[in-house]
Amino acid sequence: MTEKQSNLIVRTVTGVLFVAVMVTGMAFRPEALILLFALITGLTTWEYCGIVNQREDISVNRFITTAAAVYLNLAFAGYCSGVTPPAVFIPYLLTIVYLLVAELYLKQPNPVNDWAYTMLSQLYIALPLSMVHVLAFMSTPPDGEVRFVGLVPLSVFVFLWVNDTGAYCAGSLLGRHKLFPRVSPG
């Protein structure tokens, strides 16, 4: 078996397991969707902060930034499902203010960069993953009752997966020269 075939098999098995977890988490129960995306938000924010903190003169508070991201995800879930009022976002905003103000007193070499990387984690990871709840919970106009529609976020992910898979296959079969060598796989 060649290295390319082995790589394809590993990608396929990983992809099938990932899709199974995502479909199970999105399609059946709202609690599963909320838990799945809170977990994904927490893990990706934690990983992002770890990568950013490896840079010289950058120090992002990994724990509080991750906790804020997970809280934002859960706050969106509660608000969109109709369980909590809009005031549920106030603790998140206070946490963001804390992260900004605390940076002034930590005497870091470049606090503006630390702010930028902290806010980027919230805008690049936490906010988009929290928006899944906006798609999943819909209110019906006549009675205003909120209902869970897991098919909508699932369809968005299916479109993304199909597009990504098609791009990978086209690039593997047709492409001989990488358009962007720094970001192209393999």
Which functions belong to the PLM regions below?
Residues 2-186:
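Membrane-embedded alpha-helical bundles of polytopic integral membrane proteins
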